């Protein structure tokens, strides 16, 4: 194993052309996902609801937050359609929605617009998704550091005896998120051991949400995320920091992203992965 120019120990020597080709395909898919008609770039507003029924920006009907959930009052002429796993239903009268805290919201369609009804901590809000939002129509791509095999690293996963529900802050003051921490991931950079709390992902995968010395300089201040496949039987992992991504809040002020877990700040500059959007 060779020592990298900055002291990073790569997992193996890989042909940079292969690494670049794989990354190019991944990055193109990532940008395409961001730019879908109702993706993160389409957010146009974030409106916090009160118990008083009131109009919402851009869509008809009256909306309010109650202890039971979000109440919508509308007529068929208002053309509000609630998406459902079974079949869409048009609002005719009063409907109560029950979004889950910290999860993707319930979607209500109005023509080309989509209202995402979300719950965050003890509050409810509406996120308006508009394909014509300036953040989407002016999108030209996500800047990133040059691909470098030095940032493909060996790591080890040490699972906790039991998963832990932890509290982290949010980019919106006063909100909290409650992800599940499942263990620690350790690796070495510049000869120094680095440790990150790993959050649960789907099907045993891990999510590493961290800050580093680039945060607030060339990358988003609130940190970035690396998604990792499920560890091997002995806890072995490969971390490809070239695939570190921004959270949605790096692209829009209307997201409510979590902040990294306490202690998830690396002592090095991870000059790999996505940079701060222009």
Q: What feature does the model see in each segment?
A:
Residues 1-21, 28, 278:
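Actinobacteria-biased recognition of intrinsically disordered, low-complexity terminal regions
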Residues 5-7, 215, 236-238, 242-278:
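Extended, aromatic/histidine-rich regions of cofactor-dependent oxidoreductases associated
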Residues 49-100:
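Forkhead-associated
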């Amino acid at each position: 194993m060779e020592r990298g120019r900055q002291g990073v120990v790569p997992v193996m020597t890989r042909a940079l052309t292969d690494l670049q080709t794989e990354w190019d395909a991944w990055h193109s898919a990532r940008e395409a996902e961001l730019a879908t008609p109702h993706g993160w770039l389409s957010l146009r507003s974030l409106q916090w609801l009160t118990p008083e029924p009131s109009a919402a920006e851009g869509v008809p009907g009256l909306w309010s937050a109650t202890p039971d959930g979000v109440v919508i009052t509308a007529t068929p002429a208002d053309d509000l359609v609630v998406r459902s796993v079974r079949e869409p239903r048009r609002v005719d009268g009063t409907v109560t929605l029950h979004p889950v805290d910290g999860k993707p919201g319930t979607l209500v369609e109005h023509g080309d617009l989509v209202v995402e009804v979300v719950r965050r901590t003890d509050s409810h809000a509406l996120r308006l998704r508009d394909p014509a939002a300036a953040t989407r129509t002016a999108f030209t791509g996500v800047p990133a550091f040059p691909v470098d095999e030095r940032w493909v690293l060996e790591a080890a996963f040490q699972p906790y005896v039991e998963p832990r529900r932890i509290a982290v802050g949010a980019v919106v003051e006063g909100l909290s998120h409650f992800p599940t921490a499942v263990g620690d991931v350790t690796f070495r950079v510049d000869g120094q051991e680095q440790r990150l709390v790993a959050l649960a992902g789907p099907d045993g995968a891990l999510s590493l949400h961290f800050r580093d010395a680039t945060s607030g300089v060339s990358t988003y201040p609130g940190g970035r995320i690396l998604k990792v496949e499920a560890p091997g039987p002995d806890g072995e992992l490969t971390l490809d920091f070239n695939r570190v991504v921004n959270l949605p809040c790096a692209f829009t002020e209307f997201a409510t992203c979590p902040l990294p877990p306490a202690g998830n700040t690396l002592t090095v500059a991870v000059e790999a992965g996505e940079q701060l959007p222009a």
